């Protein structure tokens, strides 16, 4: 059994990790840390997990937790995983970080967007960006994995076939994305207060969202050149889900069937990417609670654009589900282990 500890287990991504790992056939949970619920049984914090784990939340004692675990997940705010990573790797163990601390090759990019010093910059070259669909081989056996952000996951999967084939202008990409409120985390804030969010639809962090450079770095790798995207996120009154609508400009506009075949062929062997046939469009409810990404690609002859639509569950393929997929790859398991189930509908 793979012994797993979770640092920061009582946020939404931590809870989703616990939900997935309690039913994973090759995992034993050995520690769940929390600053807010020390001594509480985990199921008292999240009652839906009663009878699935009897672990109590514990204060972080990193050396002791590392001794017990083969791998740690960190589900912490940015800036808090650096010291954890250094300790874990120095002890010969593995780390999957669900935060942003190891997603960038360039320390200066991280520091300019996240406004904190990177105190473990020597580990950045060692980190593997954890999007299996573009980085699978590098993830096998990796000891430090930077789990992607939710918006980048939806955006990169939506654009990868077009950029890999060189069919679109890399300087003409517009990403318009909508997310449910769980993406903001479990902490209380006016922005996610029921009375502020219900029956409301709002843009936020226009032009300055911290996922922008992450999207640009990974799309630039696919395109083979630096690029800039226009990215605008929106908050919508639902709990889970991201829907990204992506506008691109090709040199020559393919027809509907050509685009479908391009995407279907590119993702043919991918267990969690579903390319919808012409006439069907992604919807967040169809992926809720699953590790799937649903894609559709549509030509717009009137404007000469190719429009891509990408839907994921921000807590699953956008966070914890993808982290478990990465865990499976790290330890040489079938990457779908513990992740094959339909979502809830309606």
From Swiss-Prot:
Entry-linked InterPro entries: AGPR_AS, AGPR_type-1, NAD(P)-bd_dom_sf, NAGSA_dehydrogenase, Semialdehyde_DH_NAD-bd
Q: Which GO terms describe its molecular function?
A: N-acetyl-gamma-glutamyl-phosphate reductase activity; NAD binding; NADP+ binding
- From the Swiss-Prot or TrEMBL record, give the protein name: N-acetyl-gamma-glutamyl-phosphate reductase
Pfam families referenced in this protein's UniProt entry, alphabetically:
Semialdhyde_dh, Semialdhyde_dhC_1
Coarse class of the primary localization is cytoplasm
Q: Write out the similarity annotation.
A: Belongs to the NAGSA dehydrogenase family. Type 1 subfamily.
**Originating organism:** Desulforudis audaxviator (strain MP104C)
KW Amino-acid biosynthesis (keyword) present: yes
| Catalytic activity, as annotated | N-acetyl-L-glutamate 5-semialdehyde + phosphate + NADP(+) = N-acetyl-L-glutamyl 5-phosphate + NADPH + H(+)
Q: Name one GO cellular component term.
A: cytoplasm
What is this protein's gene name?
argC
Organism domain of life: Bacteria
Does the keyword DNA-binding belong to this entry?
no
């Amino acid at each position: 059994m793979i012994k797993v500890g979770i640092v920061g287990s009582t946020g939404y991504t931590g809870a989703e990790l616990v939900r997935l790992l309690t039913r994973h056939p090759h995992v034993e949970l050995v520690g769940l840390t929390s600053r807010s619920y020390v001594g509480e049984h985990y199921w008292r914090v999240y009652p839906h997990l009663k009878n699935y784990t009897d672990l109590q939340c514990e204060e972080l004692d990193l050396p002791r937790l590392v001794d017990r675990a083969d791998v740690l997940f960190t589900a912490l705010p940015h800036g808090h995983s650096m010291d954890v990573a250094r300790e874990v790797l120095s002890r010969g163990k593995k780390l999957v970080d669900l935060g942003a601390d190891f997603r960038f090759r360039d320390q200066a990019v991280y520091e300019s967007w996240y406004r904190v010093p990177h105190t473990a910059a020597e580990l950045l070259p060692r980190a593997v960006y954890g999007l299996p669909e573009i980085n699978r081989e590098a993830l096998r056996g990796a000891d430090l994995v930077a789990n992607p952000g939710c918006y980048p996951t939806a955006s990169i999967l939506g654009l990868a076939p077009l950029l890999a084939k060189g069919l679109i202008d890399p300087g003409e990409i517009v990403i318009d994305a909508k997310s449910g409120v769980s993406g903001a985390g479990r902490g209380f804030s006016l922005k996610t207060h029921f009375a502020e969010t219900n029956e409301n639809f709002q843009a936020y962090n226009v032009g300055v969202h911290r996922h922008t450079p992450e999207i640009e770095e990974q799309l630039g790798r696919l395109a083979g050149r630096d690029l800039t995207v226009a990215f605008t996120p929106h908050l919508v009154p639902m709990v889970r889900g991201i829907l990204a609508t992506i506008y691109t400009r090709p040199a020559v506009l393919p027809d509907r069937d050509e685009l479908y075949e391009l995407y279907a062929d590119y993702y043919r062997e991918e267990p969690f990417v579903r390319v919808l046939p012409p006439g069907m469009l992604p919807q967040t409810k169809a992926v809720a609670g699953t590790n799937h990404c649903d894609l559709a690609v549509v030509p717009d002859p009137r404007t000469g654009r190719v429009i891509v639509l990408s839907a994921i569950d921000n807590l699953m393929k956008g966070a914890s589900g993808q982290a478990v997929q990465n865990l499976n790859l790290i330890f040489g398991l079938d990457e779908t282990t513990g992740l094959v189930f339909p979502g809830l509908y309606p």
